[in-house]
A protein has these predicted regions:
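Short low-complexity stretches enriched in small and charged residues
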Residues: 1-3, 31-34
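C-terminal lobe/tail of nucleotide-utilizing enzymes
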Residues: 32-111
């Protein structure tokens, strides 16, 4: 249903992915489905990306580059996992707001 909704509103897609193991497969499948439906994918956002203090995970470290390369996506945005991000309160930590503000959303939407 998301594909039908995306086609209806006519805006480029921004795919949001998780950072962990398996995300390359899930994201590439999503990109394939979107493109097969004739939709333009403008960016992939990897949400809750671990910060510097998080334990090192080689799969997480490799995911952004592999998604960009194998998914043929020019823009892969990392939004770090911050304690002040709260979905229920609809709040973002200043670091996350800064990252999101750097993306040219109007340009992506073709406005």
């Amino acid at each position: 249903w998301v594909i039908h909704f995306a086609r209806l509103i006519g805006l480029p897609l921004v795919v949001v992915a998780r950072p962990g193991l398996g995300t390359i497969n899930h994201t590439l499948l999503t990109l394939h489905a979107a493109r097969s439906a004739g939709l333009h994918v403008a960016a992939v956002v990897i949400n809750r990306y671990p910060g510097d203090a998080a334990p090192f995970d080689p799969s997480v470290a490799a995911n952004p580059a592999q998604i960009g390369l194998r998914g043929k996506v020019d823009r892969v945005v990392l939004v770090t996992d911050e304690p002040d991000n709260d979905v229920e309160e609809a709040t973002l930590a200043p670091a996350a707001e800064t990252i999101i503000a750097q993306v040219p959303w109007a340009q992506i939407a073709g406005l």
